[in-house]
Structures are given as structure tokens and as C-alpha cells.
From Swiss-Prot:
Short name of one Pfam family: Ribosomal_L32p
Cellular component annotations (GO), alphabetically ordered: large ribosomal subunit
Keywords, sorted A to Z: Ribonucleoprotein, Ribosomal protein
Membrane-traversing stretches: none
Any one GO BP annotation for this protein: translation
Name the record gives this protein: Large ribosomal subunit protein bL32
GO MF term list: structural constituent of ribosome
UniProt xrefs under InterPro entries: Ribosomal_bL32 (IPR002677), Ribosomal_zn-bd (IPR011332)
Organism lineage: Bacteria, Bacillati, Actinomycetota, Actinomycetes, Mycobacteriales
Organism: Corynebacterium glutamicum (strain ATCC 13032 / DSM 20300 / JCM 1318 / BCRC 11384 / CCUG 27702 / LMG 3730 / NBRC 12168 / NCIMB 10025 / NRRL B-2784 / 534)
Length: 57
């Protein structure tokens, strides 16, 4: 495991952490009950089975 040679200051630690950014979720077009909706890919199967309400998307 990597071990730092020197202590990192609080300012530098927070600056490094602040550079992390979340990506937008890729949406996929799916036809459910005759209407086309764009939902995340991981929810497609649940939406087709009726486990997820697609009205909120």
C-alpha cells in the first residue's frame, strides 16, 4: 500500500478532493406501454417489468 512521504495539509487535501466531479447518467430511449421514455440503462428491465414508475422520468 502506498504511504505518503510527508503530511498533506488540510488545504491541499480539500483542493484535491474538490476536483472530483460526477458524470451525468446516460439515458436510453425505451418504449413502455406505447410511450417513449428516456431512463437510465440500469432501470430499463425494472421499468419493463412495471417495478419502476416511468412517469417521474
Amino acid at each position: 500500500m502506498a504511504v505518503p512521504k510527508r503530511r498533506m495539509s488540510r488545504a491541499n487535501t480539500r483542493m484535491r478532493r474538490s476536483q472530483w466531479k460526477a458524470d451525468n447518467v446516460a439515458l436510453q430511449e425505451v418504449k413502455i406501454d406505447g410511450q417513449t421514455v428516456r431512463i437510465p440503462r440500469r432501470l430499463v428491465k425494472a421499468a419493463q417489468l412495471g417495478l419502476v414508475d416511468v412517469e417521474q422520468f
